[in-house]
Amino acid sequence: EFAKYIDGMKVVYDTVSNELKSLLDRGEFPFVIAGDHCSAGGTIKGIQRAFPDAKLGVVWIDAHADLHTPYTTPSGNLHGMPLSTALGVENVEMVRNDVDYETKEYWESLKSNYLLPENLVFVGVRDTEAEEDYLISKFNIKNYKVDEVLSKGVGQILFEIEEKLLHCDLIYVSFDVDSMDPDESSYGTGTPVKNGIQVKDAEDLLIGLLEMPKTAVFEMVEINPCLDNKVNRMAEISFSLIKKISLLNRFQ
């Protein structure tokens, strides 16, 4: 009830983390394209297994904070929880749900406790619940809201992110397409939120982040053509972003 399909998600976490570790052990650059954002917890677990002693920096570009737990979730949807598994938080101060034993056991198995909150940066987050706001405030997690991206410009945002994560050994960039403004892009994603990042800013942001030498893993999630109000526009935009990223010198 408070963590829907968590048994299946355990399989996804294990599968993704195994593949990520294998790629990183071979010196490859993992490029993850996923549906539901909850698989990101498995991505982080894979990074942890490959680099257990490394300091990981995470740039989370998303309309949502994804900081819920089974104890705080209003929906039970695991795609709202992957960062909590990486941070290893319960958010006991904001508990609203009485979670059963089996769910607790599965939840503990998903947690990696690898990411430190000071090494997490949000970009574009604009749809959160009180329980998530509490953690953002408690840990003083930086969120570059859309208006700040517009006012400062992508170049300045990139400079500040690189400075903030300077002490990290590697960086993981997770891009949810719902971070973009659905009226400009499309509604071809599971949980679109208005007033998002402009497509060109998203492109410049991703190219800048992927050019950073410490960036070791990239992920793009939540493309859903079945929900697209412009035929297949979201997938087309996403493919264009992927193509431009793939042309960077580091991938030649």
Per-region residue spans from a language model:
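Conserved alpha-helical scaffold segments that buttress catalytic/binding sites
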Residues: E1-Q252
